[in-house]
Amino acid sequence: MLRDGTRRSYSLANAPYQEGGIELHIRHMPGGVFTDHVFSTMKEREILRFEGPLGTFFLRDDSTKPVILLASGTGFAPIKSLLEQAFFKNNTREFVLYWGARTKADLYMQDLPEQWALEHSNFKFVPVLSDATSQCNWQGRTGFVHRAVMEDYPDLSKHQVYACGAPIVIDSALRDFTTVCGLPEEEFFADSFTSMADSTPR
């Protein structure tokens, strides 16, 4: 919250077991009151007021179903928190993370899930770019991130899905996963946020 009372909501990126600070992933939105302040005028040790944590985006421990994690852009933040907590608790469920972004540069922490895949046999990472260019020499998946999930998992009837990102991405995933892939609607958990720069699916 800014001094004038302006509020913005962000998902926590650090896991519940981690102490010592709050980690947020904030994308600079030129013209945005809060992000302009953060990236241009906010000073080190400046005091901000926080409220929370709020929301219901956490791993349901009462299930053993394999988990599909869907992130778009900085929607990776709460996915990171969820996974780090699961790894800390030695959760043995199968986790597959699909992280969608426009360009390779937007996969701003790509090394981290790649490292998780090396360290945890029950975790797989699938990055997906919607606007891959020849300059980035991308050899991975392309297109909309939720459609990459559907290509790999045409039957989601026995899965749980955790998704975070722009509303258009979350809404598309919920609609298609439930109507086309047989995902029970009660097994879809989301942390959706609004961003003018994220107005098209990834």
Regions found by a protein language model. Name each.
Residues 1-46, 102-103, 129-131:
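Ferredoxin-reductase
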Residues 52-64:
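A short, basic/flexible loop-to-alpha-helix module at the beginning of a structural domain
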Residues 88-96:
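Phosphate-handling active-site elements
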